Amino acid sequence: HFHSDHIDGLGEVATLRWAGGDWDSPLMTHGPDGVAEIVSGFNLAYHRDQAYRTEHHGLEVTPPTSWGLAASAFALPEDGEAPVVFESGDLRVTAFAVDHEPVSPAVGYRIQYKDRSIAISGDTAKSANLIEMTQGVDVLFHEALSKVIVRRMNAAAKTAGNSGMAQITMDILDYHASPVEAAESAQEAGASALVVYHVVPPLPISPLEGIFKEGMDDAFDGEIEISVDGTFVSLPAGSNEIDIDSP
């Protein structure tokens, strides 16, 4: 979906790819309807930067022909559908609708490479469609928001007279999954492991992680990892091995 925290790095990704590689076309950006508008906006915002760099480094190093982003849009799938949105060799990516209302379109992705698979929830409340579309994945990457901690933040905002933060911390409760709901989804999907990402709120001290994870082990039989920046997940093809390494 197109919330700012999910797209704000696109410009830098495209620029680093362009200036640091040997490409003959812009970076193709796949997404639901609306992605062309996002791509156009980033290209407009970065156009002057491109001109500066090409003038400085030359056409061979920073050619305009490979600069920026291009869009490949697909329609929001109906529940029960998971169209292929990217395919290359043994790699196949399908998209499915999730529940992040009032934000629409919002999708998750299932990524299959040979005999291994992962699914990425995107932002969503607990979703029956997600569970259906992710059956049997090796690893489910699922967002989670601790409603216990966010409600405490909401109470603190009210006490401090911060009406804006009080409103926001109330509004966000109903369009994200709780940690236990993420674990339930992994269990119902038959996933082998659950990696929780998009962790809300951040967990800067270890006692908060205990509060965040409360009840998850009762809801899911497999391995649970609360991810941090730098968490690395590897699934060797031709095996059932799942290697998860966090800093």
Name these PLM-found stretches:
Residues 2-118, 206-243:
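Binuclear metal-dependent hydrolase catalytic cores
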Residues 107-108, 114-119, 125-229:
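Cap/insert and terminal regions of metallo-dependent hydrolase folds
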Residues 246-247:
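Short, solvent-exposed mixed-charge patches
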Residues 99-102, 123-127:
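Short beta->alpha connector loops
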